[in-house]
Regions:
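A substrate-engagement module of RecA-like helicase motors
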Residues: 2-24, 29, 76-218, 222, ...
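Walker A/P-loop
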Residues: 47-67
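Signature of the SF2 helicase/ATPase Hel1-core->accessory helical subdomain module
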Residues: 65-67, 71, 98-101, 105-111, ...
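A contiguous, basic/glycine-rich beta-loop/short-helix subdomain that forms a polymer-engagement track
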Residues: 189-216, 229-237, 337-456, 468, ...
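Conserved interdomain hinge at the start of the Helicase C-terminal
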Residues: 398, 457-492
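Conserved RecA-like P-loop NTPase helicase motor core
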Residues: 455-467, 518-619
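Conserved helicase motor "Helicase C" RecA-like lobe of SF1/SF2 P-loop NTPases
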Residues: 492-516
C-alpha cells in the first residue's frame, strides 16, 4: 500500500510541474481550477473509478484529462501492478468533429512536444480518429463515381470536391461535397471479400494503423463509442481496440447519442438510399415501388395528423394518427412480399435494412411499449418514423459502466442547480456506487466583466401572439442600440425568430444576419463583419465561439424549456405529480441549456458582455427566477436599460464604436 501511495504521490507531483512550470513556459496560463481538475481526474483513473466533472468555460479541461491519462499510463504498471505496456489505449469520445480535430491536430502534438522536451515521455504521443465507415472514402467506389459523372454537366464546385477525394481520405475534411456523392463514394457497410481495390485500400490501411500498440489515444464520437459497446454486448467483433480507460468529453450529449443508437428511425432519405442500392443490384423497380409506398404513406399521415410543437431544432414531433393505420398495415404487407422476393438475391446488409423497416412498422401497428413511438417532421416537411428505447440509462449502465474500467465524463453543463442528479439519471449512473463528482469553476471574472440584465417591466403575454413579438422586438431594438450592435440574439423558436426579425428589419441601424438551421455560412459572414446583429436558434446555443467584441451583448429571448413531445410525455408518466416532474426533469434540463447559451457571452479573460434575459419568468417575481440565478455564475445585476449603456461605456474603448 505504501508503494502504491508513493507512486500516486509522484504522479500528482508531475501534475504540479506540468501545469505550473512546463505549460506556462510554453505560453499557457496557470489556472488553479484546471490543476485541481487534473488531480481529480488522475485520482479517478488510478483508483479505477468514474468521475463526473463539470468544467466551467475557459478551464482548459482538454489539457487536464489528456495529462491525467498520460500520467495514468505512465504510473499504472507501478501503482496497479499490471503491465503498462499491454498496448491498451485510452478512448476519448466527443460529440463534435471540431473537438476531435482540435485534439488530434493541436492538443496532442503540443502536449507531446512539451513533455518530450522535459523527458516526461519516452516517445511521442500518437492518436487516431475512429469513426464509421461512411466517413471514409472507398477508392473503388470513388473511381466508379468519377467515371459516371465524367461527361455530365455537374456543378463545378461539387465536381472539384469529388475529385479532391483522390487525395483526401476523410470525407469530413472536404467541403462542398454533395450528400449524394458522399453516399456513393464512402466505404460501404459491408465490403465484398473479393473487392478489386483491396490491395491499396486506404480504409484498410487506416484500420491497420489504428490497431497498432503505439497508438495511445483512440478518438471517436459518442455514436461510435456506443456502437462498439453494443458489438461487445452482443458478442460481435469490437470496433475499438480494448481500452484501459474512457474519457467522455461533451458528455451532456451522450444521452442524445444513446437515443439514436438504442432506437430506430426511417425517413425519406433512408428510403432513397435503400432504393439507390437496390438499383445498383439491378432491382431498380423494387426501389421505385418502395419510394412510392413511403411517399403515399407520408401523404396519408399528413391528412390525419394533429399539429405538433416546434422544438429548438425546428422540428415537430407528434404521435402516429390512427386514421393512417390501415395504409401502414397495407404498406407493411407489401414490404414483406418484397422481402420474400429479394431474399438471397441482394447483399445481406441491404436485405437487413428492409427487415428493420418492416420491424419498425410492426412496432407502430401494435404500439410496442418497449419504445416511445412518434413521427418527426423537419423544416422541409419530410416525416421520419421514430422509435426511442424507454430504458436508455439501463443500456448505458449495462454496456459501458458495468464493464469496470475507469471513466471521466466532462462537460460545461453536467451540473444542474445544486447537483448532478439529472446527469446521473440520464447517463445510467444513478445506481452506480462510488461515482465521484467535481465542479471546476470558470477562471473568468464574471462579476467584473459581465452584466446580467433582466428588465423590470417584463409582463406575461400570450405565447405566439403579435403582441409578444412586438414587445420582444422593442426590447431587442433598445438593447442593440444601447450596446451599439455587437449582438447575438438566441431564440428557442424559429417561428418567433422570424416574426421578430421582420419587425426589426427597418428599425436597427446595424447589419442583421439570420441563421436558419445550421447555416455555417451565415455564422462565418457574421464573424467577418466588424459590427452586426446575429439572430439564431438551435445549434447556436452551444459550440459556437464569438471571442472579443464580436458579441458584447447576448440576448436570451426565452428560457430554454424543452417543448412537450412524446419523449417528455413518457418521462412525465414516471412521476406521481406534475410538480415533481417539473422540478426533477424540466427545470434541470432548462438550467443546463441556459448555461450553454450563457457560455456564448464570455470566451476569454478579456471579454466583456451584457447578458439579457427577456422572459418574464426570470423577472423579480417570476416563477423560475431562483432557478435561473442558481444556474448562472455570479454577475452584477441590472433592471434598467440605462445600466446597460453605462456598463458598455465603462468597458469598451473608442474603436468599439467606430
Amino acid at each position: 500500500m505504501c508503494c502504491k501511495n508513493e507512486y500516486q504521490k509522484r504522479a500528482h507531483g508531475e501534475v504540479e510541474r506540468i501545469f505550473r512550470e512546463l505549460l506556462p513556459e510554453a505560453g499557457l496560463h496557470v489556472r488553479e481550477e484546471q490543476i485541481r481538475l487534473c488531480h481529480e481526474m488522475l485520482d479517478a483513473l488510478m483508483k479505477n473509478e468514474i468521475t463526473l466533472c463539470d468544467a466551467g468555460v475557459g478551464i482548459g479541461k482538454t489539457y487536464a484529462y489528456l495529462t491525467a491519462c498520460i500520467l495514468m499510463r505512465k504510473y499504472s504498471v507501478l501503482h496497479s501492478g499490471y503491465s503498462g505496456c499491454d498496448g491498451r489505449p485510452v478512448v476519448v469520445s466527443t460529440s463534435s468533429i471540431a473537438l476531435q480535430k482540435a485534439i488530434i491536430e493541436e492538443y496532442v502534438p503540443f502536449l507531446s512536444d512539451v513533455l518530450l522536451k522535459a523527458d516526461l515521455l519516452q516517445g511521442e504521443l500518437k492518436a487516431v480518429v475512429r469513426k464509421g465507415k461512411e466517413h471514409f472514402v472507398c477508392d473503388y467506389r470513388l473511381a466508379q463515381r468519377l467515371e459516371a459523372v465524367r461527361d455530365k454537366n455537374k456543378n463545378q464546385v461539387q465536381m472539384e470536391a469529388l475529385k479532391s477525394l483522390r487525395h483526401n481520405f476523410d470525407l469530413d475534411s472536404v467541403h462542398n461535397l454533395s450528400g449524394f456523392d458522399r453516399r456513393l463514394g464512402c466505404v460501404p457497410k459491408f465490403c465484398p471479400r473479393e473487392c478489386p481495390g483491396k490491395a491499396g485500400c486506404r480504409y484498410q490501411k487506416h484500420l491497420d494503423t489504428s490497431r497498432k500498440e503505439d497508438i495511445f489515444l483512440q478518438i471517436c464520437n459518442h455514436n461510435y463509442l456506443l456502437a462498439d459497446a453494443m458489438h461487445r454486448a452482443n458478442g460481435y467483433r469490437p470496433l475499438l481496440a480494448d481500452y484501459r480507460a474512457l474519457v467522455v468529453d461533451e458528455a451532456h450529449k451522450l444521452p442524445e447519442a444513446a437515443s439514436q443508437m438504442y432506437g430506430r428511425s426511417i425517413g425519406k432519405e433512408d428510403v432513397q438510399e435503400i432504393s439507390y442500392f437496390l438499383s445498383r443490384e439491378h432491382k431498380g423497380s423494387e426501389g421505385k415501388r418502395l419510394q412510392e409506398w413511403f411517399a403515399a404513406l407520408q401523404e396519408e399521415i399528413r391528412k390525419h395528423r394533429k399539429d405538433g410543437i416546434e422544438d429548438m431544432a425546428g422540428k415537430e414531433s407528434f404521435y402516429f394518427p390512427p386514421g393512417a393505420g390501415s395504409l401502414l398495415a397495407q404498406t407493411k404487407e407489401r414490404l414483406q412480399l418484397m422481402i420474400r422476393r429479394l431474399a438471397g438475391n441482394i447483399p445481406y446488409w441491404i436485405f437487413r435494412r428492409l427487415e428493420e423497416m418492416d420491424e419498425l412498422f410492426g412496432w407502430f401497428l401494435k404500439n410496442d411499449k418497449r419504445y416511445i413511438l412518434f413521427l418527426q417532421q423537419d423544416s422541409r416537411g419530410h416525416l421520419t418514423f421514430m422509435a426511442v428505447n424507454r430504458e436508455i440509462p439501463k443500456y448505458l449502465d449495462a454496456t459501458l459502466w458495468s464493464r469496470g474500467f475507469p471513466a471521466i465524463l466532462t462537460s460545461g453543463t453536467l451540473k444542474a442547480g445544486n447537483g448532478f442528479a439529472r446527469t446521473r439519471q440520464m447517463t445510467g449512473l444513478e445506481k452506480e456506487t462510488g461515482v465521484r463528482e467535481c465542479v471546476a469553476e470558470s477562471p473568468f471574472c464574471y462579476k467584473e466583466n459581465c452584466l446580467l440584465y433582466i428588465p423590470e417591466n417584463l409582463k406575461p403575454i400570450k405565447k405566439g401572439s403579435r403582441e409578444e413579438a412586438e414587445q420582444l422586438a422593442g426590447q431587442i431594438r433598445d438593447l442593440v442600440c444601447s450596446t451599439y450592435g455587437h449582438t447575438l440574439v438566441l431564440f428557442t423558436s424559429y417561428i418567433l425568430m422570424g416574426s421578430v426579425q421582420q419587425l426589426l428589419r427597418d428599425q436597427i441601424p446595424f447589419p442583421m444576419v439570420q441563421v436558419w438551421r445550421n447555416s455555417q455560412e451565415e455564422i462565418a459572414r457574421f464573424k467577418k463583419m466588424e459590427n452586426a446583429v446575429l439572430f439564431a436558434a438551435g445549434s447556436c446555443w452551444e459550440g459556437v465561439d464569438f471571442p472579443g467584441d464580436m458579441v458584447s451583448s447576448l440576448i436570451i429571448v426565452k428560457l430554454p424549456f424543452s417543448v412537450p413531445d412524446p419523449i417528455h410525455e413518457a418521462q412525465r408518466e414516471q412521476y406521481r405529480s406534475l410538480e415533481s416532474y417539473i422540478q426533477t426533469i424540466v427545470v434541470p434540463d432548462m438550467q443546463k441549456k441556459l448555461r450553454q447559451g450563457f457560455g456564448r457571452a464570455i470566451r476569454t479573460e478579456q471579454d466583456t458582455c451584457v447578458v439579457s434575459i427577456l422572459d418574464h419568468r426570470a423577472a423579480k417575481k417570476g416563477k423560475y427566477r431562483s432557478d435561473v440565478l442558481e444556474a448562472l455564475p455570479k454577475c452584477r445585476m441590472a433592471e434598467r436599460i440605462e445600466e446597460v449603456e453605462d456598463f458598455i461605456r465603462s468597458r469598451k474603448v473608442e474603436r468599439y464604436y467606430s
